[in-house]
Amino acid sequence: MNVTSLFSFTSPAVKRLLGWKQGDEEEKWAEKAVDALVKKLKKKKGAMEELEKALSCPGQPSNCVTIPRSLDGRLQVSHRKGLPHVIYCRVWRWPDLQSHHELKPLECCEFPFGSKQKEVCINPYHYKRVESPVLPPVLVPRHSEYNPQHSLLAQFRNLGQNEPHMPLNATFPDSFQQPNSHPFPHSPNSSYPNSPGSSSSTYPHSPTSSDPGSPFQMPADTPPPAYLPPEDPMTQDGSQPMDTNMMAPSLPSEINRGDVQAVAYEEPKHWCSIVYYELNNRVGEAFHASSTSVLVDGFTDPSNNKNRFCLGLLSNVNRNSTIENTRRHIGKGVHLYYVGGEVYAECLSDSSIFVQSRNCNYHHGFHPTTVCKIPSGCSLKIFNNQEFAQLLAQSVNHGFETVYELTKMCTIRMSFVKGWGAEYHRQDVTSTPCWIEIHLHGPLQWLDKVLTQMGSPHNPISSVS
């Protein structure tokens, strides 16, 4: 389609605004999005002029350009629903923008999307892209705190003995409330007092999910309430990042830098790999994710899209009727985002997905092996690099085995359609018909480097080794 035919029925105002459009994909969709916006802005005196000023002078201060917030917060453009600030940031600034998780409002914005006001600002220059936080290096002591004659191998073997025979269950959002004001409620060796005995467990001193102001009432494509409560003065819109300095391990003054080895985090080429299983059988090759936005669905995609892991393509001679039926219900599956050092899972399937993430469970105060149900249309943060960094920094002072135990946190298991755990007749993930295992490469490689620096559990590092 040439430019002449594209603009043949567009108004002069829409033509002008499309002149600042970024990228060359989805021309017709962008035109419809801008046309819908122009119709709204024409009702407000000076709004069109303010938007044109912002687009033509990106480095100059500009005012909010607002439209009324819809009931569910989303805007429909040509059969596709999305959040308005995401739509217009995609049109005029970042064509590769995948999700609201990647955006943060600037301080000058009076009507940011996350503030839940009647008007929402769509000025693309009132938002910035989230950057991954810089994780402080882990400082590994050069000398062991342990007696070299004392072996921790027996303790190492028994680390999992306190785990229940089968995992407990929790349902999002019913079992999930905002954690209390401390973003990291537990130490790595603490118990999990808020373990959900059932899907109705709640947190003390936090709003229930039925509260009209609860962020969990919002659709999956809205900003996650996540890690900081609304009463915290630094996060009116939940947008401020945690101070990475709080992650830095504090060293006793008598320890000088020569007594520790700094091990830094490095972002790998592939942020994760995904392996698909049917019952206890691995099916097909591992999928290596290079894009920060990955779809795992039940369809077939002969184009070999690098952003999609299509389970419908995979064959298995041992497949039974239960597996076949479950595969038919995977549908659109799950959307995995890796943004700003955090991993989110959004259930796009009509059926629920079930997630076992120790990092997510730690954040919410659940038992480590709890399985969380994510219904259709909901999204949940399932891993946080900063919390992992804090745990790793603490664990190096407790020995090799404690650090090694964190490898379990770097693997996330997720089943489609059928759940497992105490509330289901399937007790283990290997009893579910269709499931995936997600390996987080960055945290795993970081752990590997720290463990290499520490030495082996059979021969702890010491002043005489």
From Swiss-Prot:
One Gene Ontology CC term in the entry: nucleus
Domain MH1: 12-136
GO molecular function: co-SMAD binding; DEAD/H-box RNA helicase binding; DNA-binding transcription activator activity, RNA polymerase II-specific; DNA-binding transcription factor activity, RNA polymerase II-specific; I-SMAD binding; identical protein binding; metal ion binding; primary miRNA binding
Extent of Low complexity compositional bias: 179-210
PTM-bearing positions, type Phosphoserine: S463, S465
Post-translational modification remark: Phosphorylation of the C-terminal SVS motif by BMP type 1 receptor kinase activates SMAD1 by promoting dissociation from the receptor and trimerization with SMAD4. Phosphorylation by ERK2 MAP kinase in response to EGF or HGF prevents SMAD1 nuclear accumulation and transcriptional activity in response to BMP. Dephosphorylation, probably by PPM1A, induces its export from the nucleus to the cytoplasm. Dephosphorylation is inhibited by association with EGR1. Ubiquitinated by SMAD-specific E3 ubiquitin ligase SMURF1, leading to its degradation. Monoubiquitinated, leading to prevent DNA-binding. Deubiquitination by USP15 alleviates inhibition and promotes activation of TGF-beta target genes. Dephosphorylation, probably by PPM1A, induces its export from the nucleus to the cytoplasm. Phospho-SMAD1 is ubiquitinated by CHIP leading to disruption of the SMAD1-SMAD4 complex.
Pro residues bias (residue ranges): 221-232
Localization (cell): Cytoplasm; Nucleus
Binding of Zn(2+), residues: C64, C109, C121, H126
Database matches in Gene3D superfamilies: 2.60.200.10, SMAD MH1 domain
Residue ranges occupied by any MH2 domain in the UniProt entry: 271-465
BP GO terms, sorted: anatomical structure morphogenesis; BMP signaling pathway; bone development; cardiac muscle cell proliferation; cartilage development; cell differentiation; gamete generation; hindbrain development
Entry keyword set: Acetylation, Cytoplasm, DNA-binding, Metal-binding, Nucleus, Phosphoprotein, Transcription, Transcription regulation, Ubl conjugation, Zinc
Domain of life (superkingdom): Eukaryota
Domain notes: The MH2 domain mediates phosphorylation-dependent trimerization through L3 loop binding of phosphoserines in the adjacent subunit.
Functional summary from the UniProt entry: Transcriptional modulator that plays a role in various cellular processes, including embryonic development, cell differentiation, and tissue homeostasis. Upon BMP ligand binding to their receptors at the cell surface, is phosphorylated by activated type I BMP receptors (BMPRIs) and associates with SMAD4 to form an heteromeric complex which translocates into the nucleus acting as transcription factor. In turn, the hetero-trimeric complex recognizes cis-regulatory elements containing Smad Binding Elements (SBEs) to modulate the outcome of the signaling network.
Record text on subunit structure and interactions: Found in a complex with SMAD4 and YY1. Interacts with HGS, NANOG and ZCCHC12. Upon C-terminus phosphorylation: forms trimers with another SMAD1 and the co-SMAD SMAD4. Interacts with PEBP2-alpha subunit, CREB-binding protein (CBP), p300, SMURF1, SMURF2, USP15 and HOXC8. Associates with ZNF423 or ZNF521 in response to BMP2 leading to activate transcription of BMP target genes. Interacts with SKOR1. Interacts (via MH2 domain) with LEMD3. Binding to LEMD3 results in at least a partial reduction of receptor-mediated phosphorylation.
Family note: Belongs to the dwarfin/SMAD family.
Name of the molecule in the record: Mothers against decapentaplegic homolog 1
